[in-house]
């Protein structure tokens, strides 16, 4: 079993670019199509580690879905981000849904 460093609903930062994001799903290892030679995912060691589906915002404040290796992320210590309140709201909403799932008939 592979342990992931970050959890669903957790806020993270891209280590190199500094973008704030929210983890929305986790793959225990790289699970997309075969990567191109110039992509980070060609590294076998990185492919075997967890990969994260992360929602971030572009420069216009629009949500962008990214797929990032664990090595590309760092944990975010702050809980409030006045410059990106939609990321705070998304993280809160996901955590709330995980704590109190709705029953369906």
From Swiss-Prot:
It is found in: Cytoplasm. Keywords: Cytoplasm, Stress response. One of its GO terms (biological process) is response to heat. Pfam families: YccV-like (PF08755). Gene3D superfamilies: Hemimethylated DNA-binding domain (2.30.30.390). Its main location: cytoplasm. GO terms for cellular component: cytoplasm. Residues 75-105 are annotated as: Disordered. One of its GO terms (molecular function) is DNA binding. It comes from the Bacteria. Involved in the degradation of certain denaturated proteins, including DnaA, during heat shock stress. Belongs to the HspQ family. This is Heat shock protein HspQ.
């Amino acid at each position: 079993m592979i342990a992931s460093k970050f959890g669903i609903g957790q806020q993270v930062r891209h280590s190199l670019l500094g973008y704030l994001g929210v983890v929305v799903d986790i793959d225990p290892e790289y699970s997309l199509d075969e990567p191109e030679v110039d992509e980070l995912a060609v590294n076998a060691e990185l492919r075997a580690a967890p990969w994260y589906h992360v929602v971030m915002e572009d420069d216009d404040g629009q949500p962008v879905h990214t797929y990032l290796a664990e090595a590309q992320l760092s944990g975010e210590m702050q809980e409030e981000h006045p410059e990106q309140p939609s990321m705070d709201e998304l993280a809160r909403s996901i955590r709330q849904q995980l704590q109190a799932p709705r029953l369906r008939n």
